[in-house]
Amino acid sequence: PLFEGLPPLSRDATPRHWRSYGSGKILLDDGRPKNGRIAARIAAESGETGLAQAPLCLRKGETYRGSLWTRGTAPGGLLLRVTAGDWVMTRALPAPAPEWREARFEFTAKADAGDAALQIAVPGQGDVCIDQVSLMPDAAAATGGFRPDLLEAIAGLRPPLIRWPGGCYAERYRWKDGIGPQAARGRFPVSIWDDIDTNSYGTDEFIAMCRKLGAEPLIVINAGRHDPGTPRADYIKEACEWIEYCNGPADSAWGKVRAANGHPEPYGVRLWEIDNETWSAGVEGYIAIVKEFAPAMRAADPSIVLLACG
């Protein structure tokens, strides 16, 4: 999903937010992507062909850990390079396999930089698909994956409650794509902002952030208004399953999934809002939505408090 873009790109194109270099070709491949619609593909005959992303911010002395998923053929393996001014770090990565396989790496920055670049390359001949590129400083890993400066800024606001998903994002959000192993999560095309969310921040991360900040979570459910081809009953079921994932015991159907994701104890989310800005439904239409969702959601957990839009 990291390489997806809207509107659809041609096959012979560089992935969004990356630039290509070298004599080979960079393509968008939809044959067998890792978990979205497309992956980046490097097709090279000689020399060095790769993808680069910049600018990245590095702090001297900070350790960074990353990973990427690859499949294909490259007898000479892959190269990973980080450049920051005069400092250059190069790592050799193993040759890809026919099936998707994760490659991990780490490095300690030897210089401060606001314009560092990350390069992923095939040295010589190869045909390699790449997806799910990730890079995170240890400082963020220590907070559970959150940017320390951003977490500190939010903490300074002392929010008693945090609402999520928020805005138009909530109206199309499918929560099941945002749980489980990061590299297995589905993509979320946010067409209104011409963007793609890789779902690295999902329900478990939201609850974790709220607990770090001492804020009460408020979850907004998707009522399916923008998906007329799907029966509303499917969205009601999805909302109830979300409640069970958050609040059900570890031996319930979705409580087992939560426990398998490392959280055996129920979250006890009390506040649930039925949809976001519902201007397209009209007053009577939204009343009908609430009348359909509310009884089912209360049946899933009678202790919850439901909120409706004004």
Identify the residue ranges that each predicted region occupies.
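Acidic, His- and aromatic-enriched active-site or binding-groove loops in soluble protein domains
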Residues: 107-109, 210, 235-255, 296
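Extracellular and organelle-lumenal recognition/adhesion modules and their flexible linkers in secreted
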Residues: 1-199, 216, 229-234, 240, ...
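Active-site neighborhood of glycoside hydrolase catalytic domains
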Residues: 241, 245-251, 261-271, 275-310
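Acidic (Asp/Glu)-rich catalytic clusters
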Residues: 153-155, 207-214, 247, 259-266
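Active-site-proximal beta-strand/loop segments in catalytic clefts of secreted hydrolases
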Residues: 164-167, 220-225, 272-277, 309-310
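A general structural detector for well-ordered alpha-helical segments in enzyme core domains, enriched
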Residues: 149-153, 202-209, 238, 242, ...
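Glycine-rich, acidic and aromatic/proline-enriched surface loops and short helix-turn segments
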Residues: 164-168, 203-215, 241-249
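Aromatic-rich carbohydrate-recognition surfaces in CAZymes
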Residues: 202-207, 211, 219, 235, ...
